[in-house]
Regions:
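Radical SAM enzyme [4Fe-4S]-AdoMet core and its adjacent flexible, acidic
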Residues: 48, 75-258, 262-264, 268, ...
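Short, acidic/turn-prone active-site loops that include or flank metal/cofactor-
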Residues: 54-56, 123-125, 328-330
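Conserved alpha-helical substructure of the radical SAM core
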Residues: 1-115, 323
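Hydrophobic side chains within well-formed alpha-helices
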Residues: 35-38, 138, 306
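Flexible mid-to-C-terminal extensions adjoining Fe-S/redox cofactors in radical SAM and related proteins
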Residues: 267-373
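Flexible loop residues that form catalytic
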Residues: 27, 55, 123, 191, ...
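A general structural signal for short secondary-structure junctions and capping/turn motifs
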Residues: 7-8, 250-251, 260-261, 298-302
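Short secondary-structure transition/capping segments
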Residues: 15-16, 35, 62-65, 169-171, ...
Length: 373
């Protein structure tokens, strides 16, 4: 890994824009050499932290946490290890390694906190998700990591992207299954055909991007099938943004409100597009220099043709949250969303429908601990 942001730059960027919530993205952030120190530093700044991950290294990071805690309070951790062994979430050799304590006692670990979320990427049930990520077994590892995280008291969210061929009934089944596992919230967002994604798809996979990504019309058609989800599932998007996705209202883009900082600087104008100077040395300079009125869709007209099909949360969710295109009743909707009773969906999930890919032959329906009525 040659191109990584120094830890000090990461922490100073968070302080510079003073965002209440920081999403650590990648690539895969868990291979960042100082990920534990970064999470610790952001928490010391009193920020909510989301670690966006494919979950391949989650269980390893949680075992490192257990090793530290076992040294401090073995009597409390021993029963947890027993549960993890019974659930086959750690192996006997991994449990013994935990009992030996941390390899480096000075190294911080990622501990459970109500202000930190594992944000696990899941784009469908087993078969579809493994196809999208081009690797068998990834879905299964995601579920194992989620189960382990909930046993240990972590907050867990999931992030799902909807594409042209996505079956919304499948996503509904996924959300119900994840609710049964105790997942704390879900982000569901439309797949947008930004330039880098289109180039990668055509070059690496030989796929026509227009057959994969959503137009604005496609997005509304897809999400209109899911109007009830906001009341049924613990969605992390505001009700106003969900109404936008379902075609029941219009919003404008506020890309400046969820800025992206990478190794080159503050990316402008947004997570998807890079224009003008491309990257700025400071957040303030980016805010002042970018002509924000040149982007987004206003009254059905795209200010920039590349924005025509974008309805993603990083541009439009802040508009909804900040009330920038507000209507009577929006404030009350957001108050209820933030402080009202949260949905608690229950229902039996047929595990053969969930594990419908590489693990189908394992007959997961014989594992009743995965389901609660």
């Amino acid at each position: 890994m040659k191109n990584v942001m120094p830890l000090e730059d990461c922490l100073s960027a968070a302080a510079e824009c003073d965002a209440p919530m920081v999403s650590i993205c990648g690539g895969e952030p868990l291979i960042y050499p100082q990920i534990e120190a970064l999470v610790q530093g952001l928490r010391e700044q009193r920020r909510i932290v989301y670690i966006c991950t494919n979950a391949m290294f989650m269980r390893r990071k949680m075992r490192e946490y257990l090793a530290v805690e076992y040294k401090k309070r073995p009597a409390e951790i021993e029963p947890l290890l027993g549960t993890l062994l019974d659930e086959r979430l750690v192996t006997p050799s991994e449990a013994e390694q935990v009992k030996k304590g941390p390899k480096d006692a000075s190294k911080p670990v990622i501990s459970p906190s109500k202000w930190m979320y594992w944000n696990v990427h899941l784009d469908g049930l087993e078969k579809i998700h493994d196809i999208i990520v081009e690797r068998e077994g990834v879905f299964q590892e995601c579920i194992l990591a989620i189960r382990m995280a909930k046993i240990l008291g972590y907050q867990v969210a999931t992030n799902t992207t909807v594409y042209r061929e996505t079956d919304m009934k499948e996503i509904e089944t996924l959300l119900l299954y994840l609710a049964n596992l105790g997942v704390d919230g879900h982000t569901v967002t439309p797949g947008y055909d930004y330039d880098a994604a289109k180039t990668d798809m055509a070059k690496r996979l030989g796929i026509d991007p227009s057959a994969f990504f959503l137009t604005r019309r496609n997005t509304i058609e897809k999400f209109s099938q899911a109007k009830s989800w906001g009341k049924r599932f613990r969605l992390l998007g505001t009700p106003v943004y969900w109404e936008f996705l379902t075609g029941d209202r219009d919003l404008t883009c506020s890309a400046w409100a969820i800025p992206t900082r990478n190794i080159m600087g503050w990316k402008a104008p947004c997570y998807f597009l890079t224009d003008g100077k491309g990257h700025y040395p400071s957040y303030a300079e980016m805010l002042a220099d970018v002509d924000w009125d040149s982007y987004g869709v206003v009254d059905g007209v795209a200010k920039d043709p590349r924005c025509e099909n974008c309805m993603t949360h990083c541009g439009y969710e802040p508009t909804a949250a900040l009330g920038l295109k507000g209507k009577p009743g929006d404030t009350w909707k957001n108050i209820l969303f933030n402080f009202g009773a949260r949905p608690n969906p229950k229902g039996k999930v047929v595990l053969s429908e969930v594990f419908n890919g590489v693990s189908a032959a394992a007959k997961p329906e014989k594992n009743p601990e995965l389901v609660r009525e």
